[in-house]
Regions:
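Thiamine diphosphate
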Residues: 2-6, 12-210, 214, 217-366, ...
Length: 366
């Protein structure tokens, strides 16, 4: 049954954009954000790509490296979301190959390859199914360099499609980043645009530490922009200000960026200026960028799709409070998913633009 559901995921993603329009939710293609300073050169001379095409382009460049391989369920024929399309044809079966349906085995195999000097890219077909590999990631990959005194490294990349997709339910729509941002030794990334996805993916491939690259699957086809077809990287641990503002700072990442942008635009029409920050990297994260913004505005809202209690936003709010306590003019606020398993009725569960607008008004008028 899982196979049948997974096979239909491509159709679900394609349909979700139209469904979202019918229900009035925000679409990523409505927004174009300017590159941050220093990134414009890397992104110029672009070709229009959606996010899955940008990931495919990044993987193509990565596989051109001598000791890089790609493995996972169905990656040889292109994968459920087509991110690995034609890569086996171009790079051969020794570089791109299928694995059995066992996440623990996929990641464990990748850890072994990394331990002997290869740089594997392991795909977990849905982030919801990453938990059988939790021990391999947290107890093996993340600790490998530490327990060898940095004499050996475990440079590997785990790709995992994540987050809401329209009506994926409890096993195909979860945001699981908070389980891994608590683990020293890992680097965690979640892009919000095609150009970010390619540049950050290639930077992860250059890292000597294990990286988890979460790909918001609702953006695979709905997020479209010009992407440089050549090799380029973007730095890990660096966020960017998408919209400058003076009244309140809003911090987010992944597909929630577009929801936050819609809420910020709605607030602007009511005379409220929102500064919007896309973290991009969750571990490490750009603590200084956020602190500087909050000290300027005096107010902050953190938003993500994952449940609120003990979520990643709690760490952000705690750190912001430590750094900006004397500058805060209102309590830091979190607008997150509900503390329930992920339901089929996503619009009820997710922190949509109307919930964010209410939070913006509440914080600004505190």
């Amino acid at each position: 049954m899982r196979r049948l559901f997974d096979a239909s995921a491509t159709a679900v993603v394609a349909a979700s954009s139209a469904a979202a329009k019918r229900h009035g939710s925000v679409q990523p293609s409505e927004f174009v954000f300017a590159p941050a300073p220093g990134e414009e050169e890397a992104m110029r001379n672009g070709v229009k790509m959606n996010l899955f095409q940008a990931v495919n382009s990044g993987l193509d460049h990565a596989l051109s490296k001598e000791r890089t391989v790609l493995l996972g369920e169905d990656v040889a024929f292109g994968g459920v979301f087509r991110c690995t399309l034609d890569l086996r044809k171009k790079h051969g079966p020794q570089k791109v190959f299928d694995s059995p349906l066992t996440e623990q085995g996929i990641v464990g195999f990748a850890v072994g390859m990394a331990a002997v000097g290869w740089h594997p890219i392991a795909e977990v077909q849905f982030a919801d199914y990453i938990f059988p590999a939790f021990d391999q990631i947290v107890n093996e990959a993340a600790k490998y360099r530490f327990r060898t005194g940095s004499n050996f490294h475990c440079g590997m990349l785990i790709r995992a499609p994540c987050s809401a997709v329209g009506h994926g339910g409890i096993y195909h729509s979860q945001s699981v980043e908070g389980y891994f941002t608590h683990c020293p030794g890992l680097k965690i990334v979640m892009p919000s645009s095609p150009s970010e996805a390619k540049g950050l993916l290639l930077k992860c491939v250059e890292e000597n530490d294990p990286c988890i690259f979460f790909e918001p699957k609702i953006l695979y086809r709905s997020a479209v922009e010009e992407v440089n077809p050549d090799y380029y990287t973007l730095p890990l641990g660096k966020g960017r200000i998408l919209v400058e503002g003076r009244d309140v700072t809003m911090v987010t990442y992944g597909s929630q960026v577009y929801v936050a942008a819609k809420a910020a635009e709605m607030a602007r029409k009511e005379g409220i200026s929102v500064e919007l920050i896309d973290l991009r990297s969750l571990l490490p994260w750009d603590r200084q960028l956020v602190a500087d913004s909050v000290k300027k505005t005096g107010k902050v809202i953190v938003t993500h799709e994952a449940p609120k209690t003990s979520g990643y936003g709690a760490e952000l709010v705690s750190s912001i409070t430590e750094d900006c306590f004397l500058s805060l003019e209102a309590p830091p606020t979190r607008v997150c998913g509900l503390d329930t398993p992920f339901p089929l009725h996503e619009r009820l569960y997710l922190p949509n633009e109307l919930k964010l607008l209410d939070a913006i008004k509440s914080v600004v008028h505190f």
